[in-house]
């Protein structure tokens, strides 16, 4: 690993070799080159972060190393915690809402069933009233037909037999209307 101290030592060694007599000049310069090359093997450039040359000798571009800051990491951790809490709260709220909806639906169905029961009882009482009124009307028609038949019998006997058949037909028709009203389901009244 190259430090400024290593650089100084390498320069001194190169300078010392250059001070030797000129006889061995060629021999002395070569070792200095070899020494500097040997030192460069362990030297790392601070610009491109590669071994083999000094920073001032670098011809490459500076490499960007992404080092996330501690504050950014802490912010991410806080956001994750907040998101987890929000998810848990939303899950809890949805569960509560589901329970509330179930309770509402149960209460609505029970109230609707009770209201339908009460409306059914109301309609049945109304149908009973209509059947009693129709039966009273039938009895009125029977009396009128019987009175007409009695007046007809005073005039002629043949007409009285005809009126008796008329009264019997009217009574049979009234019974058929009663039976049909009992078979049909009660009709609901429209509310205004």
Swiss-Prot record:
Residues 109-136, 144-179 have a biased composition (Low complexity). InterPro entries: ZCCHC10, Znf_CCHC_sf. One of its GO terms (molecular function) is zinc ion binding. Keywords: Metal-binding, Zinc, Zinc-finger. The keyword Zinc-finger applies. It comes from the Eukaryota. This is Zinc finger CCHC domain-containing protein 10. It comes from Homo sapiens (Human). The gene is ZCCHC10.
């Amino acid at each position: 690993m190259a430090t400024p101290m290593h650089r100084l030592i390498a320069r001194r060694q190169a300078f010392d070799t250059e001070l030797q007599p000129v006889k061995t000049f060629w021999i002395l310069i070569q070792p200095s080159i070899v020494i500097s090359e040997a030192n460069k093997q362990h030297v790392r450039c601070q610009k491109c972060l590669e071994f083999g040359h000094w920073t001032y000798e670098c011809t490459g571009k500076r490499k960007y190393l992404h080092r996330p800051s501690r504050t950014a990491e802490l912010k991410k951790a806080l956001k994750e915690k907040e998101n987890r809490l929000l998810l848990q709260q939303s899950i809890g709220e949805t569960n509560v809402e589901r329970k509330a909806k179930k309770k509402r639906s149960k209460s609505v169905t029970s109230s609707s069933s009770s209201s339908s029961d009460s409306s059914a009882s109301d309609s049945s009482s109304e149908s009973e009233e209509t059947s009693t009124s129709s039966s009273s009307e039938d009895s009125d028609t029977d009396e009128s037909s019987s009175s007409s038949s009695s007046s007809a019998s005073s005039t002629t006997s043949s007409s009285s037999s005809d009126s008796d058949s008329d009264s019997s037909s009217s009574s049979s028709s009234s019974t058929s209307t009663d039976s049909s009203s009992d078979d049909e389901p009660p009709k609901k009244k429209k509310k205004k």
